[in-house]
Amino acid sequence: MSLLTEVETPIRNEWGCRCNDSSDPLVVAASIIGILHLILWILDRLFFKCIYRLFKHGLKRGPSTEGVPESMREEYRKEQQSAVDADDSHFVNIELE
């Protein structure tokens, strides 16, 4: 017996659910959560580059530079920027002989 036949059964030539009590608070809550999950998933797929770039670069804060000389701060910024630049290059050229 498959899971499909246990959950959904043909009713008068149509596929339907045998949930007669759809006003149950648990069913309503599950429906709302399911709809919200679908909306968030669609938004994530549409804007994933913007969202993850924001989290990756925008929300990261380096260690406190209080009391650190300006030359060391500049060196740290250059290191961080070079790491970001290296991270953005996703493609590698490989030549085969």
Swiss-Prot record:
GO cellular-component term (any): membrane
Annotated InterPro entries: Flu_M2
Protein's cellular compartments: Virion membrane; Host apical cell membrane
GO biological process terms, semicolon-separated: protein complex oligomerization; symbiont genome entry into host cell via pore formation in plasma membrane; symbiont-mediated suppression of host autophagy
Residues with the Phosphoserine modification: 64, 82
Sorted UniProt keywords: Disulfide bond, Glycoprotein, Host cell membrane, Host membrane, Host-virus interaction, Hydrogen ion transport, Inhibition of host autophagy by virus, Ion channel, Ion transport, Lipoprotein, Membrane, Palmitate, Phosphoprotein, Signal-anchor, Transmembrane, Transmembrane helix, Transport, Viral ion channel, Virion
Site (Seems to be involved in pH gating): 41
Topology, Virion surface side: 1-22
Domain notes: Cytoplasmic tail plays an important role in virion assembly and morphogenesis.
Family in the record: Belongs to the influenza viruses matrix protein M2 family.
Protein name per the record: Matrix protein 2
Species this chain originates from: Influenza A virus (strain A/USA:Iowa/1943 H1N1)
Gene: M
